[in-house]
A protein has these predicted regions:
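Histidine-centered catalytic micro-motifs
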Residues: 64-74, 119-126, 178-185
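Active-site metal-binding loops of divalent metal-dependent hydrolases
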Residues: 42-43, 69, 93-94, 124-125, ...
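Hydrophobic "anchor" residues on beta-strands that sit immediately upstream
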Residues: 37, 87, 115, 120, ...
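Accessory terminal helices/loops
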Residues: 2-4, 163-177, 181-242
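Divalent metal-coordination and catalytic microenvironments
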Residues: 29, 41, 68, 80, ...
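Conserved beta-strand hairpin/beta-sheet module of binuclear metal-dependent hydrolase folds
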Residues: 6-59, 130-139, 146
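Active-site HxH/HxHxD metal-binding segment of metal-dependent hydrolases
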Residues: 23, 44-118, 197-198, 203-205
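Core dinuclear metal-dependent hydrolase active-site scaffold
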Residues: 16, 28, 108-136
Length: 242
């Protein structure tokens, strides 16, 4: 079965992990037939946890996929690469230094017998991407469970974010599972159908102009670790003294 040009397979394993400090999700995907695996959005402070899980499951880690330059925590990508030698992938508009591979819209990463498709979804930042495979969308900070990422820093743009969600992500089947990079209330996943129906920011009843105006009225403090996280993440998570 083909979904937006990607072969949909049923046997892909996915594990979801949480960092309580940043309320950030990381995802481990692996092919159960040959144990090829990738990490999406690892968190630096969870390096030991992530490497321990990969070792325990006897997985062959072949890549680290980032959805965007995070502003609230430092990615574990640089440290994992330093330890394992696996490559780091970012979207082509992210502006990061030191990534091994830059992904254009529609590019696919082969992991064992399945493909992960890159979808450029700018708006939260200009370099945001989402990833699709096997009926699952990993949406970073573009689409949340009942919300969307903020658009008031890192070259964010509300109109662009609205288009990324409604013209790209909402084109996937309604039963597509959505896994975001954050949740602050304990929810773990949603579906495209649920977000189209109920998302208060970008659901079917909200037009683009209303969303843009609502974003202008929001006044939120920057993330606590913004001043350290962004410079490090512009270098794939490299901390200046390492």
């Amino acid at each position: 079965m083909l979904i937006n040009g990607v072969k949909r397979m049923e046997k892909i394993n996915m594990r979801q992990y949480f960092d309580y400090e940043s309320c950030a999700y990381s995802y481990l995907l692996f092919d159960p037939c040959n144990n090829k695996s990738i990490l999406i959005d690892p968190v630096l402070e969870k390096f030991d946890r992530d490497m321990g899980i990969i070792k325990k499951l006897d997985l062959d880690l072949i890549g680290i996929l980032e959805t965007h330059v995070h502003a609230d925590h430092i990615t574990g990508a640089f440290t994992i690469r330093k330890s394992t030698g696996v490559p780091i992938y970012y979207g082509s508009q992210s502006g990061v230094r030191g990534a091994d591979f830059i992904l254009n819209d529609g590019d696919c990463i082969q992991v064992g017998q399945f493909e992960i498709k890159t979808i450029h979804t700018p708006g939260h930042t200009k370099g945001c991407v989402s990833y699709y495979t096997c009926g699952m969308l990993f949406t970073g900070d573009t689409l949340f469970i009942g919300g969307t990422g903020r658009t008031d820093f890192q070259d964010g743009d509300a109109g662009t974010l609205y288009d990324s969600v409604t013209k790209k992500l909402f084109q996937y089947p309604e039963d597509t599972q959505v896994y975001p990079a954050h949740n602050y209330s304990g929810e773990m996943k949603t579906t495209i159908g649920e977000e189209k129906k109920w998302n208060p920011n970008v659901g079917d009843s909200i037009d683009k102009e209303s969303f843009v105006e609502a974003e202008k009225l929001k006044n939120r403090p920057y993330p606590k670790h913004f001043d350290t996280a962004v410079p490090a993440n512009m270098q794939c998570g490299r901390v200046s003294n390492k």
